[in-house]
Amino acid sequence: MALTHDHLQTDTIAAIATAMSEAGIGIIRISGSEASAIGSKLYRTSKKQKTDISRWRPGTIRFGYIVETDQEGNENVIDEVMLSWMKNPHSYTTEDTVEINTHGGMFLMNRILELVLGAGARMAEPGEFTKRAFLGGRIDLARAEAVMDLISSQNEFARKTSAAQLQGAVSEKIRELRGKILYEIAFIESALDDPENYSLDGYPERLMDTCLYLEKEMNDLLSRAEEGRILREGIRTAIVGRPNVGKSSLLNFLTGEERAIVTEIEGTTRDTLSETVRVGGVLLHLTDTAGIRDTEDKVEQIGVHRAQQALENADLILFLVDSSRELSQEDAQIAERIIARLDEGTNCIILVNKSDLSSLVTEEEVKSLFLSRGRECPALLFCSLQTGEGIRELSEYVAELFHTGEIAEKNEIFLTNLRHKDAVKEARDSIRLVEGSIESGMSEDFFSIDLMNAYRVLGTILGEAVEDDLVEEIFSRFCLGK
């Protein structure tokens, strides 16, 4: 069923809104009809006098003390605080809200939270403050989800796209598309109900133009969704090559730590090893893999299989070739696997390692691994993991490959939420069905069915006509205090 304001809870909730660690400042947030009363019970002015917080001018923050009253009626100061008061509906949750800014010790914050709960508040559930903002109508569901995305962002692209979504960029685009769909639905219904005043002559052609526009806009959103996912979550990067070409050395070099064992013995790496690093401003989820080759060793076979899986799932492949050894059949077999991935849009960079040693491999020979199979050779860089030669060029090329600087300057809308992507995809498919109905010469009432579905599905992104269970599941991912 659709959510309404009737679902708003009347009890008052509280939680620590800052990180659960020692810091200069910690915040205890209280929201609900009893927020001011609870705050007034515990807060004393700078002169240690009682005050009715509800009489303060909304948006006020004042210095004072949080006190605990013992059994004899004596008030003991717990901490000096700054207390802010926000009157409904002009608060984060749209409810009366009190925030206690205290010193950020974990014991101290929990102690004050205990007093707040003892004064009548209930412990908030994860994401409940933002959920109340959604139920109160201050933000739609897409903007509510952006709050958690912003908190969990790990790079500038993720921060920027989350901030744009929080400000309503995604919501505005979805409303624009829904508005065009609703206009067509209303016109068809009016024409069917009142044919004397609404003519359908030539209408299918005009509707087709609208559908083609809608399909293009949705396709644009979907095409940028995968790009957005990669840049937001990081690039799944597989380091592949035959045994002992320097894969583990590359992982160690990029992480700045001795994460992988490096020896001259082939097959040292028996399993995949993952680390996350930033290269060229891009977050790479690196996977060091076992050398891909035919082997009778059962344990190494498992490692080779996992290496092949990492290659299959990668957004970026770093293919290492040893310049101090001649190319082998193993190099050729790996190139064949990479070509299959290139055909599916995966990126690849070839790193010809050990350039500080006498080379037995030419650039043309490496390129021939791909050219001889009718495929253009990916970017090729010479490097030395002993001297660091070529690593700067690698960073620059990764940044260029994923053009993060270019994207950062654009105001494009990116769907970074899988739920949103699935909804747009379903809506796009419904629009295609309308196009098919027009081409088949079907009557106008058939158009409305699929138009209505597209309108409804896009509405779920905003939180319209969504089930309670979905809302509960979304907000359960949030942290306490948000």
Question: Residues of each region from the PLM?
Answer:
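Generic enzyme active-site microenvironment
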Residues: L286, L320, L351
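Switch I (G2) and immediately adjacent beta-strands of P-loop GTPase domains
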Residues: R62-D79, L83-K87, G267-T295, N313-L316
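C-terminal-of-GTPase-core extension/linker across diverse P-loop GTPases
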Residues: A2, H7-I16, M20, E156-E275, ...
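Conserved G/P- and acidic residue-centered "switch" motifs that form tight phosphate/ATP-binding loops
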Residues: G137, N244, D288
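A glycine-rich (often HGG/GG-containing) alpha/beta subdomain
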Residues: M1-K160, A164, G168, R341-L342, ...
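Inter-motif core of Ras-like GTPase G domains
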Residues: E300-S324
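Glycine-rich, N-terminal phosphate-binding loop of Rossmann-like dinucleotide-binding domains
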Residues: I30, T102-G104, L254, T289, ...
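Conserved beta-strand segments of alpha/beta enzyme cores
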Residues: R122, L283-H285, A379
